[in-house]
Amino acid sequence: MPICTTRDGVEIFYKDWGQGRPVVFIHGWPLNGDAWQDQLKAVVDAGYRGIAHDRRGHGHSTPVWDGYDFDTFADDLNDLLTDLDLRDVTLVAHSMGGGELARYVGRHGTGRLRSAVLLSAIPPVMIKSDKNPDGVPDEVFDALKNGVLTERSQFWKDTAEGFFSANRPGNKVTQGNKDAFWYMAMAQTIEGGVRCVDAFGYTDFTEDLKKFDIPTLVVHGDDDQVVPIDATGRKSAQIIPNAELKVYEGSSHGIAMVPGDKEKFNRDLLEFLNK
């Protein structure tokens, strides 16, 4: 099983398929690298090398108690890129993974990178405030933590509805999508589930985004019920120099998994990679 051991002894599991220029996928909360199966196949079939790791406390990586903050996540990512000696990398990050990508650039720069893709990602900041009126209210994050702590198995089933906008007429989500979400969520540690909410809910990545000096594609659904586009994707595209924004009309937070949306995203991703 492919493992990268971090500077503090955590074992990070990753998939490493294909050959060619590397594309590294960073998953969201509460998922793992399996969320990127369709994208991994798409890039490998197109001649790229696809890599997707499980964040600490997620999937097959070490179920640690500590280290659920973005400085640590960014350093874990740096350990992976360094261990595999990856260069000319495109980082593709979903949701919470977008914070990991942004903080990686903020802490480690873009020397190993070619480009970046932010998909339904949390930067610049999620929490609602006077400066961020379109953000998410504090009580939402409290409810997320409470759900993880009290009855997480049912909570993840309920959460999948909004994640995929299954509560909208004409939605394209399948029962398989929901089942896959639940399976991955249950592989996350309970402590990681709670602490990640504090991390992605309240961390401000504005200064990290200002350090981007590589081509960046921002993709976001305008019906994202988890990470509102007006507070995140649109603002990130304004902050990152020369970023390209693609808005998917009517699409949910689960673009990379839902039939129809995932094929569209794969086409846009490959077009961006081929530039």
UniProtKB/Swiss-Prot annotation:
It is an enzyme of class 1 (oxidoreductase). Keywords: Antibiotic biosynthesis, Oxidoreductase, Peroxidase. Disulfide bonds: none annotated. Residues 22-255 form the AB hydrolase-1 domain. Its EC number is 1.11.1.-. GO terms for molecular function: peroxidase activity. The active site is at 95 (charge relay system), 224 (charge relay system), 253 (charge relay system). One of its GO terms (biological process) is antibiotic biosynthetic process. Brominating activity not inhibited by azide, peroxidase activity stimulated by bromide. Belongs to the AB hydrolase superfamily. Bacterial non-heme haloperoxidase / perhydrolase family. Homodimer. May be a chlorinating enzyme involved in 7-chlorotetracycline biosynthesis. Able to brominate as well. This is Non-heme chloroperoxidase CPO-A1. It comes from Kitasatospora aureofaciens (Streptomyces aureofaciens). The lineage of its organism: Bacteria, Bacillati, Actinomycetota, Actinomycetes, Kitasatosporales. The gene is bpoA1.
